[in-house]
Amino acid sequence: DVNAVYIDADEGSDIIVVMDFRSAAEAAGFAAVQTKIRVAKDARVLLVQIQRLGQGFRFLNDVAAKTEESAGFEQIELILGGADTYQGSRTDLVGAHSTLKTDIGYLLKNEEHLDMNYIANHIGRKTECAIDVKGVLRDEAHKLFRGTIDLRKGAKGALGNELEDVLLMDDHVINQTIPVILCDEEDVEGNHGATIGRIDEALLFYLESRGMSQAEVYEMMAGARIDSVIHKIPDAATRDRVFEELKGHKEERYDD
């Protein structure tokens, strides 16, 4: 099953699109989605994609976006299922002062495989991108993340940031990260940071001294990473569906 989607945000518009790819837990098959987005001057687009397909699914997800002057594109990606998932995203920040904000959360288990390739092309002046990746690897899961920030000639004053936080729950997981920062302009800044591994020993000791077992600490920290991405989804009904699948209950909300 292959689908194509085109989103055209007119000048000054504000659009939120939610795509929830799901199936029965035991389902198998192949699915592919290509999403192309144009964000006109002063427009805003938020794309939320949630992948919770069955254990036998191979899924291909491709996103291509182009931003014009002072436009903003934001994407929230949650990968929670599927046997093999291939995620690709390319954003051309063409217009001056345009921005990209990407939040990715993934939870991989068994022998699930996730291959991600995210590209931010800084073309216009004073463009900005922020790519934030949070993930949990269990059992014998395999993850590859490629993140490229391309600061091109003419993109004066551009700023690109990329941050990854990966919690390794078991000894047999495979984690691969390939950050790339390309620079063809002087007055620009590109940064990459990563926290990969197990929980800090001092924190683990502190929580264990408060009565938690090591397994409970790891489960709590794993949940916190994914929850932080889920909470960014603006649609409460979508958040509830994801929380019900992961935790068996809806999102807990607290009144001010």
Identify the role of each PLM range.
Residues D1-M212, S228-D256:
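Conserved beta-strand/loop scaffold segments within soluble protein domains that form the structured core
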